[in-house]
Every structure is written in C-alpha cells, then in structure tokens.
Regions:
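Short, solvent-exposed loop/turn elements at domain surfaces
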Residues: 27, 43-50, 65-72, 101-104, ...
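Conserved functional hotspot residues or short segments at active or partner-binding sites
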Residues: 341-342, 346-573
Length: 573
C-alpha cells in the first residue's frame, strides 16, 4: 500500500512538473514571437513605426483580454494611479468640461481650492496657460497642463461669459485632495453621511461625521454609498470597524499567489455597536463599497436599502515596473463574512464564450443554475454572484440611458436618478444651455438663500426654456428611430402595407414637441436647474443637500429606521 501511495505521489509530481514545463515553454515561445514580429515590422514595414505607441497598444490589448481592472500605467500616467488610490493630485481643484464649440470651460470648482480662491467661475472659457494657447485641445490635454507640482504658479487667461475683455488669473497649484465625505446633515432625527469614494483617511472622516451627528441628536445613521465605485480595501475594513466589535473577520482575499491570501479583521474598538444603521446602495455601488454594505449585511448590523449593487468582487494590487511604470492587476477575489463572493461577471467564461462565437458564429447557451445559498450571522439567507441584494428594495421607474448611449452619465446618485427618467433630461444635462442659464442666473443674483430655503420660480423655468429653444437644442428621439427601424423591417418582411395604418398612428403619437416634452418634465428639469445654480454658491455639499430633499431611497430607509420592530425583523433579531 505504501509503495502504491509513493508511486501516486511521484506520478502526480511528474504531471505537475510536466504541466509547468509546458507552460514555461508556451510563455517563452510567444514572448519570442512577439519580439520577433515587432522587429520585423520595425525593419520592413512601409512606414516608420512609433515604438511607444505600437508596443503600448499591444500591452493594452493583452490587459484588456483579461478584465477591465487590469491596466498598465506608464510613467507619464502614474499621477492618475496615485489620484485613484489617495484622492490627491497637484492642480487647481476644479472639474473642467468641453462645450459644443470645442472650448474648455470651468465646470465645477472645489471649495477652498486654488480655482475658487482666485475667483474662477463656472462657465469661464479657458484660453491660455501662460503663453500656451489652449484652442483645439481636448479636456485631457488641458487637464494635464493645469496639473503639476504643488507650489508652481502660472497665469490662466479666461473669457468670462457676457464680458468683452478677457481676464488673467495668477494661480498657484496645490496638493488637491477631494473630500470623501462631501456632505453630512440631519434628516429629522436621522444622521445622513454621503461617502463618495474610499481614499486614504475616509474611515476617519466617517468616524468624525458619526460623532458630530450624534452630538446633534442623531438616533440612527444613513450611510450613502450610491455611485461609490470603491477604492482602498483597508479603509472599507476600518469603516465597518466603527460599527462591529474588535477582532471580527470582515473580508478574506483568495488568489493564485500566496501573497494574495489574506484575512482582514477589525483592529480597533468600535465607535457604536447599537445605533440603527441603513446603507444606501445602487447599481454603481462597487468594490470596497460592496465590502462595507455586504459585511454589515452579513453581520446583521445594518439594513441595506436601494437597488442591487454592481457586483465587483475582484481585488487589484499594483506591481512596480521598469522605467517607473506600474501594472495594476487583479490578484484575488474577496469573500465577505458569510463566505460569499459577490463578483457578478465571470471574465474567464466570457473569454471562452467569445472564442466559441468567433469559431462557430454561435453564442453558447446560458445554463440556468441555482445560486449558492449562504447565511448571515443570524441565519438569514443570502446569495453570491449577483452583487449585494438590498434588504429593502426600492423600485425606480426608469431606464438607464446607457442602454441607448454608450457614454458615462454621472457619478452622482441624485443626477443619475434624474437622467434615467428621460432622454430629454439626459440631453439637457449634457447641453451648454443649462450652463448658460446657470451663468446668467449667477451673474444676476449675488447671493443665494440657504439650500433648504431655495426654490426656483416659474419665471426661472420660462427663462431656461427660452435659452434652450434659442440655442437650437436637439435631442436624440429614440422612439422615432426605433419606429423607423421597425418600418424597414416590416417592409423587408412584407408586412408594412398590412400595418401601414398602425404605423401612421404611431408616427403621430411619437412626434416630438419640445414645448410639450419640457413641460411634461418640468419638475425634473427644475431639479437639474437647481443643481446647476446651487453648485455655484454652495459647491458639491449644497448639491447633495438639495438632492436629498426628495429621495425615494432615503424615504424608504427612514420608514424602516422609524419602525424598531420592522428594523429588527429585517435583521432577524
């Protein structure tokens, strides 16, 4: 028997050794091929090659084959990676955007930062940085010029709307760190905290916020993680630690390399083990945000309110590369206290399916499978592989514009909710008319009331409507487009003449009238207008304060928080 076991162990070792040898040969073979192919191209291709661009595109194609989170950062892009992890960069502290005429403008300055302090305003058109003409530059190119070493100074020339002369501003770059907590406040007897990202120190910011709100009489806490795409894992663990005991396992990472195997536990005494807690989530709540919401759900410490989260259960780490570059790559999956992994998309399976489709032209059938059931600390059932499902689901009557338009919407939950109601709102938000109206309003109103007291008038709406119509505003009419496509399909298949009467009736129904469409969406348009005005006086904090005045997720959270028996029932207590 011992001889048989020894033989089996020896055979297994040989198989492993053989597999590793084959793998190493394959790696060496294709690296040699890549190197040889590039050298042949460099020598004999009809045009001269730009080595950095050609080879970098090859590297990017390789990383894109894996997942969206594995990214190569050359030396010139390391500032972007640093900003993602720390929230810090050297610059002026303002968001910029491009107008339809291809000029770049100040879009949203941050409070107490160089742009705001020197007097730059929303709508200012950027013309020159020192002697560098910005005409024809993209926003990324202008942004690169605005950033630099803290302490360096430059002269920024701008054209302010409705002024004939240009203005020059002397701006000194500073180390910019966006606050992860743009707003805290009281909603009745509940404390509200908006957390936008998990950067260095954010858990401490939340701690201070909770203490401040409790001093103001908060009997419960609402933590808003909507549109929070995540960030640093250790900050997520430290945040959960505020509400759960010391030495509690929060998340475990598992990967191929031993360095990726790690268990994260709470290291500090908690801030408050008893205060009722609600976590707001949506389909853009991802990564570290899902660790927080998922761990607090698994430990039956908080109710989760909103819509199902994104489902990113992958962990990235950075590896230093030669020539001061870096590779951010996926090294592990994370598992929250119940043992579940909430990663939604299996990228390896996607690659296999794509290969089958490439070879056969057929898409593999999706197999229905039961999701594995896990249990919270109190025995409640939860599942893996689909993000975090809320304990209190809030159904929003909306369809995301990303189904029709492959561009980013907004990273602010309140704005996303509005834009998902109508393509008219989507286009108005991205149109210059909204900024132009906001600039006109700002220039004629030196001050603004407190956010809680601010309202727009019917005349304000009429003024905006007039600016929209005068600007020759156009928006994509998807219903008309889809109807036209359906007509062509019906003609191709020979059904059009039979259904012509119905098609004609639909054409009349779908005929767009801007006046009618705007008036139908007047309340939502006024919310967009209010956000555009408020940011000029009260910055992002004011926008959040205004948005939560009418928020379905917050209303749902408050309903449960104000009902102790329902709160305990949901948590299984």
């Amino acid at each position: 028997m011992r001889k048989i076991l020894s033989f089996l162990v020896f055979s297994l070792a040989c198989l492993c050794s053989s597999a590793q040898t084959e793998h190493n040969f394959t790696v060496a073979k294709y690296l040699d091929l890549f190197n040889t192919i590039y050298r042949q191209l460099d020598l004999f291709y009809v045009d001269s090659l730009e080595a950095d661009k050609v080879i970098r595109s090859g590297i990017e194609a390789m990383t894109e084959e894996l997942d969206p989170y594995t990214v190569f950062y050359p030396e010139e892009d390391m500032g972007e990676l640093k900003m993602m992890t720390t929230g810090k960069y050297g610059g002026i502290g303002s968001i910029i955007r491009m107008r339809k005429d291809s000029t770049v403008i100040i879009h949203e300055p941050y409070p107490n930062m160089p742009a705001a302090e020197v007097g730059l305003q929303v709508g200012d058109v950027l013309l020159k940085i020192d002697d560098k003409d910005l005409k024809g530059m993209s926003t990324s190119e202008v942004s690169e010029l605005l950033r630099g070493e803290p302490g360096t100074t430059f002269v920024l020339r701008v054209q302010r709307p409705n002024e004939k002369k240009t203005r020059d501003f002397k701006v000194t770059r500073r180390s910019i760190k966006k606050t992860a907590v743009p707003y805290i406040g009281m909603i009745g007897d509940a404390g509200y905290i908006s957390l936008t990202e998990f950067t260095e120190g954010c858990a401490k910011e939340v701690r201070k916020s909770v203490i401040s709100l409790k001093e103001k009489g908060a009997k419960s806490i609402i933590l808003d993680l909507r549109s929070n795409g995540g960030g640093l894992l250790n900050e997520a663990v430290d945040l959960v630690n505020l509400f759960v005991p010391k030495n509690q396992k929060i998340v475990e990472t598992k990967g191929k390399h031993i360095a990726a195997q790690y268990t994260y536990t709470t290291n500090n005494e908690p801030l408050d083990l008893d205060i009722p807690l609600a976590i707001l989530v949506d389909n853009s709540t991802a990564s570290a945000s899902e660790i927080v919401s998922g761990a607090l759900q698994d430990l039956d410490r908080a109710i989760v309110v909103g819509t199902e989260t994104y489902g990113k259960g992958l962990v990235q780490s950075s590896r230093q590369l030669p020539y001061n570059g870096s590779l951010k790559l996926t090294t592990a999956k994370y598992y929250i206290p119940s043992g579940r992994c909430i990663q939604k998309i299996d990228y390896q399976q996607l690659r296999k399916d794509a290969e089958v489709y490439r070879k056969t032209g057929k898409r593999p059938e999706k197999k229905d499978s039961l999701k594995t059931i896990f249990h919270t600390a109190g025995g409640r059932e939860v599942t893996e592989g689909s993000g975090i499902k809320p304990d209190v689901a809030v159904k929003h009557d909306s369809i995301s514009p990303t189904l029709f338009y492959p561009i980013a919407i907004s990273n602010e939950a309140s704005i996303r909710e509005l834009l998902e109601k109508s393509n008219l709102l989507f286009y108005l938000y991205n149109d210059d008319a909204l900024i132009d109206w906001g600039t006109k309003y700002f220039q004629s109103h030196p001050t603004l009331p407190a956010v809680k007291d601010f309202t727009l008038t019917d005349q304000d709406y009429a003024d905006f409507k007039q600016i929209v119509k005068a600007s020759d505003f156009k928006y994509d009419r998807m219903s008309e487009k889809r109807l036209e496509e359906l007509k062509k399909t019906a003609q191709f298949e020979g059904y059009y003449e039979d259904a012509k009467e119905e098609f004609d009736a639909l054409e009349k129904k779908f005929a767009h009238n801007l006046d009618r469409e705007m008036d139908r969406r007047k309340d939502d348009i006024c919310r967009l207008m209010a956000q555009e005005v408020i940011k000029r006086y009260h910055y992002q904090a004011g926008k959040v304060e205004d948005a939560i005045k009418k928020d379905e997720d917050i209303e749902a959270a408050l309903t449960v928080l104000h009902n102790e028996s329902e709160y305990k029932k949901i948590l299984g207590k």
